[in-house]
Amino acid sequence: MQTAGALFISPALIRCCTRGLIRPVSASFLNSPVNSSKQPSYSNFPLQVARREFQTSVVSRDIDTAAKFIGAGAATVGVAGSGAGIGTVFGSLIIGYARNPSLKQQLFSYAILGFALSEAMGLFCLMVAFLILFAM
């Protein structure tokens, strides 16, 4: 005995539609019969839309976006470390100058060198954060 739903749906329709829903578009086009006119016939694939992108799920894209933001945030932490380093360098300059004012020129040149290195690391961290956000 067949149910009422099985009487109205032919097996050919079930095969055509479920195969199009389960298989990727590229596999369906590669296994389709070749037309004699060399023109692709889209009437054989009623439920498929030709797309030129990877078939990723919404959950996968959300995970990728969250990972991108987490990575950019972790790279931005280095900018705060750069600020702490600059504060330490100039704090040491003030302490050193207070202890021995005659070494003012040498202490200042070392402070500028420390500032430049610390600032370069901060800018490098910021550059990596922007690369993660906008280049990936």
From Swiss-Prot:
Reaction it catalyzes: H(+)(in) = H(+)(out)
Pfam families linked: ATP-synt_C
Example GO BP: proton transmembrane transport
Domain of life from the UniProt record: Eukaryota
Subcellular location: Mitochondrion membrane
Annotated site location: Reversibly protonated during proton transport: E119
Signal peptide: none
Positions of post-translational N6,N6,N6-trimethyllysine modification: K104
GO MF term set: lipid binding; proton channel activity
GO CC annotation: mitochondrial inner membrane; mitochondrion; proton-transporting ATP synthase complex; proton-transporting two-sector ATPase complex, proton-transporting domain
PROSITE patterns (UniProt xref): ATPASE_C
Modification after translation: Trimethylated by ATPSCKMT at Lys-104. Methylation is required for proper incorporation of the C subunit into the ATP synthase complex and mitochondrial respiration.
Keywords for the protein's UniProt record, in alphabetical order: CF(0), Hydrogen ion transport, Ion transport, Lipid-binding, Membrane, Methylation, Mitochondrion, Transit peptide, Transmembrane, Transmembrane helix, Transport
Note: There are three genes which encode the mitochondrial ATP synthase proteolipid and they specify precursors with different import sequences but identical mature proteins. Is the major protein stored in the storage bodies of animals or humans affected with ceroid lipofuscinosis (Batten disease).
Quaternary organization: Homooctamer; the c-ring consists of eight c subunits forming a circle, and each subunit adopts a hairpin shape. Component of the ATP synthase complex composed at least of ATP5F1A/subunit alpha, ATP5F1B/subunit beta, ATP5MC1/subunit c (homooctomer), MT-ATP6/subunit a, MT-ATP8/subunit 8, ATP5ME/subunit e, ATP5MF/subunit f, ATP5MG/subunit g, ATP5MK/subunit k, ATP5MJ/subunit j, ATP5F1C/subunit gamma, ATP5F1D/subunit delta, ATP5F1E/subunit epsilon, ATP5PF/subunit F6, ATP5PB/subunit b, ATP5PD/subunit d, ATP5PO/subunit OSCP.
Family assignment from sequence similarity: Belongs to the ATPase C chain family.
Protein name: ATP synthase F(0) complex subunit C1, mitochondrial
Organism: Homo sapiens
